[in-house]
Amino acid sequence: MASLARAMLALLALYAAAIAAAPSTTTALDTTPNGGGGGNSSEGELSPSPPPTPAPASPEAGAVSTPPVPPPSVSRRKPPRNNNRTRVHGDKATAHGRKRIVCRERLFSARVGDAVSFGCAVFPRAGETFEVRFYRRGRFRSPDADPEYFDEPPRPELPRERLLFSSANASLAHADALAPVVVEGERATVANVSGEVSVRVAAADAETEGVYTWRVLSANGTEVRSANVSLLLYSQPEFGLSAPPVLFGEPFRAVCVVRDYYPRRSVRLRWFADEHPVDAAFVTNSTVADELGRRTRVSVVNVTRADVPGLAAADAADALAPSLRCEAVWYRDSVASQRFSEALRPHVYHPAAVSVRFVEGFAVCDGLCVPPEARLAWSDHAADTVYHLGACAEHPGLLNVRSARPLSDLDGPVDYTCRLEGLPSQLPVFEDTQRYDASPASVSWPVVSSMIVVIAGIGILAIVLVIMATCVYYRQAGP
């Protein structure tokens, strides 16, 4: 029983020690700022107090020693970072949190001809100046595009680098005076309003595309900070294809136009005849540039069936032309492109025969193998009578027609011109001109000449008869 009593007393002593240690640990946690703790606490933090050692039991009670209770775990957090030390667009903040140069945007993409405005806020320190410079560079060139062949050389480019504005002059008039130096016609102007230095381009073109740099300079001219704003331009082209009519036997022709594209050297163009590639030897290319730098490319193909491998030859009865297709790809930049494609089949005409003659007081015009949509007309627009003579035997689908009109009442020579109208303007003119002389001398001379011919004929006949009679007489009178 004595040993059981000693064990009970030991348990009671252990419980009392645990109760005594709990208040001391709670106080240590409450005095730790920001919830921090641990042996590596920052300056001004309090470490938790260790629990007191429990009192041993009296020898009389036979007390047993117990191990100390470990302190509860405490979370550790790093102090908050100083957000004033940041980098925005490469500009390091000052000690008071203000950056030297702050730009709203760093990249502008605009269409050629549009008005563009951009700028940066500049905060120089005492003794510092700032300026704005322009660098003409960074233009996109597609490696897949075709070379450009100019009918006329483009205008000479201005210097690649120019000063637009400098605060050292402390005058906006200075900026306005420098603007025409960069681009002719005062297309770029600079304004400084309360440290916001903005550039306005009235009509963005090839000479205003590039990099605009804001620079902060120290008193000795050394660059302290700089920021760049890039202006990239584009112009989506217009695409068109035309195929003028041709005469049978002539090369087929088509014209493809890619109008007002930009960047320069950003178009690839190919020709196909009935989906067979056309060799570049049968293609003529030319390029022109407008005042804004936009390009217009004109490509002309002249090809026969024999020039394109794979095309079937056409005989005289088959005037069908191949389908001529123009395909162009415009590269706006290194990742974006647009494809254009259109096909046309030129119309083939057979040459018509037009002739004028005079019959019994009428001028008669004959048109052979004429298209149904065409008609015969006189140059003086005189009233006429049209006759349809039937189909053209050589070329089915074509007609033979005739136009007759009375001769003029005017005395003297008169020209009569008959022309085939209603055909496309690209074809040659089919016409014929004959002259009829209605003067009295010209009219009577045929009668006189006829009488002379008759009299001469009678005289010759009489002479022949006399000779024959003489020969017969002498033959009969012979011995």
UniProtKB/Swiss-Prot annotation:
Sequence ranges on the Virion surface membrane side: 23-451
Q: Which keywords has UniProt assigned to this entry?
A: Disulfide bond, Glycoprotein, Host-virus interaction, Inhibition of host complement factors by virus, Membrane, Signal, Transmembrane, Transmembrane helix, Viral attachment to host adhesion receptor, Viral attachment to host cell, Viral immunoevasion, Virion, Virus entry into host cell
The role this protein plays is: Essential for the initial attachment to heparan sulfate moieties of the host cell surface proteoglycans. Plays also a role in host immune evasion by inhibiting the host complement cascade activation.
Q: Where is this region: Disordered?
A: 26-96
Which stretches does the entry tag as region HDB2? 95-101
Q: What assembly does the database describe for this protein? A: Interacts with host complement component C3; this interaction inhibits host immune response by disregulating complement cascade.
Q: Which organism is it from?
A: Suid herpesvirus 1 (strain Indiana-Funkhauser / Becker) (SuHV-1)
User: Compositional bias (Basic residues) spans?
Assistant: 75-87
Taking the first listed entry, what is the main subcellular location of this protein, grouped into a coarse class? Answer: virion
Record region (HDB1): 75-82
- Which residues fall in a compositionally biased region of kind Pro residues? 48-57
**Name of the gene:** gC
Family that this chain belongs to = Belongs to the herpesviridae glycoprotein C family.
Q: What is the name attached to this protein's record?
A: Envelope glycoprotein C homolog
Cellular component terms (Gene Ontology):
membrane; virion membrane
Please name the taxonomic classification of the source.
Answer: Viruses, Duplodnaviria, Heunggongvirae, Peploviricota, Herviviricetes
Residues bearing glycans: 40, 84, 169, 192, 220, 228, 285, 302
The protein's topology relative to the membrane is: Single-pass membrane protein
> GO biological process: any one?
symbiont entry into host cell
InterPro entries in the record: GA_GC, Ig-like_dom_sf
Q: Where is the signal peptide?
A: 1-22
